[in-house]
Amino acid sequence: MTSTESSQPADRYVVVGNPVAHSRSPFIHAAFARQTGEAVEYGRLEAPLDAFADTMRAFLAEGGYGFNVTVPFKLQAYDLADRLTPRAEAAGAVNTMWIEDGLIHGDNTDGIGLVRDIQDNLDTLLEDKRVLLLGAGGAAMGAMLPLIECRPSRIVVANRTASRASDMLEEFVEAADSFGVELWGGGLDALEQLSEDDVCDVVINASSSSLHGEVPPVPAFLLGDGVLAYDMMYGAEPTVFLQHAAQCGARTADGLGMLVEQAAEAFYIWRGVRPRTAPVLADLRAALQAERKG
């Protein structure tokens, strides 16, 4: 996990998923390596759906230094780890792994990537703010502890199934109490019961709605002027949620910055060097736009 001179053979890392050909991680980590001078080789690895653990143990046994994990293997990665960080334990999933002292370590950098994008790239400090989190699946779970650690005044979780939101919040009551954060959860239909006094400063879509071209049923007054509407999904065009939020008057941002920031955290874990993310994010955004035009 120390810096490696560029004259030495490159240390090998991969992103593992199924499918994985679409992953932007090699683009990002190649840019980090050029910027920092770290001797890193980063590729893609498609593991069989029924052989994730065996595939990754073999990768490490053959000299691999570490790897990122994308769908559908984040829960299996959690089980593969010999040691878990507190944020991986809280998320119940792992996206970053490495060997240290002969043990496989697992972390989850998704949530810290989200809050760094919001606070550093979008200049929106979360302390004392009110946050509305849409969804209660794996993406939301990974975001909860890093959000709580930013000390917002309140986090509201709204999910299609109300009981799922309540169950998720129960996992974070102790952490929320220690940071002085109020938690509330319910079904998406409960948002209709909120008043304009309940408007949140930041609305984060952590649901899968954008994948299906659906807009979560969020009342328009919750997406008005002064609100940051954030979608964890990204693309060359704004998601349907962000298009809707913009029409309601909100400032909008997609999850591309989160992708870059979570990668930067993984790079730091592996190499002990923290890369600058702004130029990489700009280059990746430009590449997406070029692909759309091409």
From Swiss-Prot:
<keyword id="KW-0057">Aromatic amino acid biosynthesis</keyword>
<comment type="pathway">
    <text>Metabolic intermediate biosynthesis; chorismate biosynthesis; chorismate from D-erythrose 4-phosphate and phosphoenolpyruvate: step 4/7.</text>
</comment>
<dbReference type="InterPro" id="IPR006151">
    <property type="entry name" value="Shikm_DH/Glu-tRNA_Rdtase"/>
</dbReference>
<keyword id="KW-0560">Oxidoreductase</keyword>
<dbReference type="GO" id="GO:0019632">
    <property type="term" value="P:shikimate metabolic process"/>
</dbReference>
<dbReference type="GO" id="GO:0050661">
    <property type="term" value="F:NADP binding"/>
</dbReference>
<comment type="function">
    <text>Involved in the biosynthesis of the chorismate, which leads to the biosynthesis of aromatic amino acids. Catalyzes the reversible NADPH linked reduction of 3-dehydroshikimate (DHSA) to yield shikimate (SA).</text>
</comment>
<feature type="binding site">
    <location>
        <begin position="135"/>
        <end position="139"/>
    </location>
    <ligand>
        <name>NADP(+)</name>
    </ligand>
</feature>
<feature type="binding site">
    <location>
        <begin position="23"/>
        <end position="25"/>
    </location>
    <ligand>
        <name>shikimate</name>
    </ligand>
</feature>
<dbReference type="GO" id="GO:0004764">
    <property type="term" value="F:shikimate 3-dehydrogenase (NADP+) activity"/>
</dbReference>
<dbReference type="InterPro" id="IPR013708">
    <property type="entry name" value="Shikimate_DH-bd_N"/>
</dbReference>
<dbReference type="GO" id="GO:0008652">
    <property type="term" value="P:amino acid biosynthetic process"/>
</dbReference>
<keyword id="KW-0521">NADP</keyword>
<dbReference type="GO" id="GO:0009423">
    <property type="term" value="P:chorismate biosynthetic process"/>
</dbReference>
<dbReference type="InterPro" id="IPR022893">
    <property type="entry name" value="Shikimate_DH_fam"/>
</dbReference>
<feature type="binding site">
    <location>
        <position position="234"/>
    </location>
    <ligand>
        <name>shikimate</name>
    </ligand>
</feature>
<dbReference type="GO" id="GO:0009073">
    <property type="term" value="P:aromatic amino acid family biosynthetic process"/>
</dbReference>
<feature type="binding site">
    <location>
        <position position="95"/>
    </location>
    <ligand>
        <name>shikimate</name>
    </ligand>
</feature>
<dbReference type="Pfam" id="PF01488">
    <property type="entry name" value="Shikimate_DH"/>
</dbReference>
<dbReference type="InterPro" id="IPR036291">
    <property type="entry name" value="NAD(P)-bd_dom_sf"/>
</dbReference>
<feature type="binding site">
    <location>
        <position position="110"/>
    </location>
    <ligand>
        <name>shikimate</name>
    </ligand>
</feature>
<feature type="binding site">
    <location>
        <position position="232"/>
    </location>
    <ligand>
        <name>NADP(+)</name>
    </ligand>
</feature>
<dbReference type="InterPro" id="IPR046346">
    <property type="entry name" value="Aminoacid_DH-like_N_sf"/>
</dbReference>
<feature type="binding site">
    <location>
        <begin position="159"/>
        <end position="164"/>
    </location>
    <ligand>
        <name>NADP(+)</name>
    </ligand>
</feature>
<comment type="similarity">
    <text>Belongs to the shikimate dehydrogenase family.</text>
</comment>
<protein>
    <recommendedName>
        <fullName>Shikimate dehydrogenase (NADP(+))</fullName>
        <ecNumber>1.1.1.25</ecNumber>
    </recommendedName>
</protein>
<dbReference type="InterPro" id="IPR041121">
    <property type="entry name" value="SDH_C"/>
</dbReference>
<dbReference type="InterPro" id="IPR011342">
    <property type="entry name" value="Shikimate_DH"/>
</dbReference>
<feature type="binding site">
    <location>
        <position position="255"/>
    </location>
    <ligand>
        <name>NADP(+)</name>
    </ligand>
</feature>
<dbReference type="GO" id="GO:0005829">
    <property type="term" value="C:cytosol"/>
</dbReference>
<dbReference type="Pfam" id="PF08501">
    <property type="entry name" value="Shikimate_dh_N"/>
</dbReference>
<feature type="binding site">
    <location>
        <position position="70"/>
    </location>
    <ligand>
        <name>shikimate</name>
    </ligand>
</feature>
<comment type="subunit">
    <text>Homodimer.</text>
</comment>
<keyword id="KW-0028">Amino-acid biosynthesis</keyword>
<feature type="active site" description="Proton acceptor">
    <location>
        <position position="74"/>
    </location>
</feature>
<dbReference type="Pfam" id="PF18317">
    <property type="entry name" value="SDH_C"/>
</dbReference>
